[in-house]
Amino acid sequence: HVHNSCFLSFVLDDFCIPVGAHGCGSSSGCPGGADCPLCPSALQACGCPLYWKGPLFCSAGGERTGSVSVHKFVAMWRKVVQNCHDDAAKFVHLLMNPGCNYLVQEDFIPFLQDVVNTHPGLAFLKEASEFHSRYITTVIQRIFYTVNRSWSGRITCAELRRSTFLQNVALLEEEADINQLTEYFSYEHFYVIYCKFWELDTDHDLLIDSQDLARHNDHAISTKMIERIFSGAVTRGRKVQKEGKISYADFVWFLISEEDKKTPTSIEYWFRCMDLDGDGALSMFELEYFYEEQCRRLDSMAIEALPFEDCLCQMLDLVKPQSEGKITLHDLKKCKLANVFFDTFFNIEKYLDHEQKEQVSLLRESESEGPELSDWEKYAAEEYDILVAEEAAGEPWEDG
């Protein structure tokens, strides 16, 4: 029986969980308000980082009732401890739908809404609720882009364990500047992605067609590659095939893949696009199919293109495939210059940029030691500075 005192302790197995019967009095923003037992000391006693409070609150029934009793919280936590033996299993258990053993995109929404509501680095969003869902969509896509290595749309315990996601959730508590958390949560990164999408989405229905996407970066990407992106090879749902449009969520994957072609997901993304027959290997025919358009575009710019045979020799020398006559996903992941390979076949601007650099300097760039910024982080930082400068110069980017 729980007495109505300000501070109570409950012993649960080996845990001593302090529970505030009248709220924790914390500025951290307990999701259940005044009567929520999830004070920081309770979370600490459970061995949970602060920003697990949302999932814990929902899992104990708080989402339905608006509050959580001590009894419900203890019963819920006992079940978690009995069934889950590490943080990844606990986190999946707290967020998943009953009867599942994996997480789908929607499962992350309550957790991320709590981050938006209570993280000091996102306090300015209180007045801009229309951006909540767009920021949350962006973070969810980044989570699945990095963590869901199987491309299944379902994050398993094993995938979560192999990722850095839970370490990043723990860092939310320590880092007041959310923009320092560049892997998933950075607001500046969201802002860059959303502004880039907004420029292309002229009717602002949060959908873009192939002509809209072709305008990205001044038509740098070939028509054949744009067609492949809209073929369904790298998008979810049937809207692409039915209506010829991709969503903002699809665009997040596209932009991160386009600006950083060295990550495993990005290499898989572009490999899927180039593998026209889906046989798991890029044939010489497939390479020529994409290179033909590059040659035509170079001709129109009065630049002499390398004959395909010469280009092919260069690329085979670059990738060093295991089997003759085809390039596999494994070959490209092993090669440190996958970005140069892909840009050669479908991004005219970046292809010309690589051509101006010596291969040795390209390799040196890719092998530099230390915590070097990723290509995506460099791009996002540069673009954010440009956006801020444009706004300061009186070209405000506004939400319609």
Predicted regions and their residues:
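Long, highly charged low-complexity segments
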Residues: 1, 16-28, 169, 188-191, ...
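HEAT/armadillo-like alpha-solenoid scaffolds in large eukaryotic assembly and transport factors
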Residues: 123-132, 178-182, 215, 300-305
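Core solenoid repeat modules with strong leucine/isoleucine-rich periodicity
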Residues: 153-160, 168-174, 180-183, 187-211
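Polyampholytic low-complexity alpha-helical segments
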Residues: 1-33, 39, 45-60, 83-93, ...
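Amphipathic alpha-helical scaffolding segments
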Residues: 55-59, 90-97, 106-114, 158-168, ...
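Primarily EF-hand calcium-binding motifs
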Residues: 11-33, 37-78, 85-105, 126-154, ...
